[in-house]
Amino acid sequence: MPGKRSFIDSRPKPFIALKQIDMDTFYRHVFIIAERRYPVTLYEQLVIELTNQSFSLQAAYRSGGTPYELSDREPEPYDQQIEDFARMIEEADCVLAGGASGLSAAGGGDFYYEDNATYRKHFGKFAERYGFKGAFEGSFYRWPTAEARWGYLATFLDTTLNAPLRKPYRDLDAILAEKDFFVLTTNQDTQFVKLYPWEKVAEIQGDHRFFQCSRCCTDAVWDAVEPVSNMVEAMGDGLEVPTELVPRCPHCGAEAFPWVRGYGNFLQGELYEEQYRKVSDWLDAHARQRILFLELGVGRMTPAFIQEPFWALTAQLPQASYIAVNNKTQFLPRAIEDRGLAVRADIADVLADVRKTLGR
């Protein structure tokens, strides 16, 4: 598109430095791309650029690292990091919280990638029958029938839909209680929408509460909660659902799918674009304030959705600051080391300790 400016430096080299852009470019945040039905908003444009860039840098991600230049400063002791975290919360005018899989895992939703007690509690019969070593493994299995596939998918969806609000989320809520904030998440497990109204959360990877047409014949999504409950009840101790309960598109009759990235032909229609509009509008309204970008539990599968946009935006907004909490990595780009904090520790412990420090 003529005149479009990149948000980041996309020069091909082993380690990428975050690049500043002029503020006029930042605020001109709606781009129209040919052959698209919807305008591309600020945050989605940033994700698209970072995702496209990442294709040539997969070796760094596969090894558990990042291609960005990182700070080489020695981290402060844990207690000091907690004090700094609390201080940065208090000093910020507003907070954009980005929650990923590590946040839910820290509160007991740790059945996705591990064959542990939580996984066995909810998926034991499938582990015994198929040998899965985590919930995600079953999500990509080549099921022999639709009835078998939905026996598993219904169990998976039911597990997240009926999970209680996990403690790290309650602690985060207390930390944010006195702030102007917005939540961006790649989690599909509905934890955030159990806590906050729809307009305060952007679920850019989908939501387990909805079905879509597997053929994307329609832009519509529809309720999955009641059909999932019916399938689980009918299945009982078995592994398959009755044929008549296999969910189908009410428009074309094709098999339905959960409205989430990763299960198939993810519908990127009006509901999807609404998520990006919400976070982009929030950024547009707050960009000249002291924004704290708070990243929680981002892994190496999808860094271009929360982590790398937060890095780029912190670098681009002169009053912004950044905090990351992760139990496996401690990534802080050199470009934002003077305005950033990276804590490598259990997310549940960190949020509980920050809440205590703030007296909330």
Stretches found by the model and what they are:
Residues 16-17, 33:
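Alpha-helical interaction segments
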Residues 22, 26-360:
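Conserved catalytic alpha/beta core of Sir2/sirtuin-type deacylases, generalized to analogous enzyme cores
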Residues 5, 10-11, 27, 33:
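Short terminal hydrophobic/aromatic SLiMs and anchors at protein ends
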Residues 5, 14, 20:
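Cationic, low-complexity basic patches in intrinsically disordered or flexible, solvent-exposed regions
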